[in-house]
Amino acid sequence: MKSFHKKPQRGVSLIEVLVALLITSFGLLGMAALQARAVKGNHSSMQKTQATIMSYYILDAMRVDRDNAKLLNYNTGSLDGSGKIGPICNAAAITGTTLAENNKRDWITALKASIGNSADSTTCGAVLCDANGNCRVQVRWDDTRAGGLGVQIVETHSRL
């Protein structure tokens, strides 16, 4: 009877290398997807922070021009049934030359620059004050580009 003595295997086979490479590539793809999702979430968070800063921007302008704010010259619309204030979405629609009109125009222009872009019709600002100086400011934008839930609203309440 013939006896076959196998030599012990040395090194790794090509299949083992390919399997290891496949597992590593899936891991790297998963890490890349996780990084992309984190970047989208970071962008969404940055927009929310910018919206808050921009609401303080118009509130500070109204504090400087308190008399006009109490005369309701900064109001952009009235409150509807869903709690939204009539917004301004286009700075060019504000044609007045008073300090209040200039402040609103500058505010909407800055909103578009920091959150959306000048052609964006979904980035809007809204202000509603009463004669006692109690004000609500809403900033709206579309967050779907950043993987968000669509229209976002940041609302700030303040007394002048």
Spell out what each predicted region is:
Residues R10-L22:
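N-terminal signal-anchor/signal peptide hydrophobic helix marking the start
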Residues I23-S45:
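C-terminal juxtamembrane segment of a hydrophobic transmembrane alpha-helix
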Residues M1-V12:
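N-terminal leader/signal peptides at the extreme start of proteins
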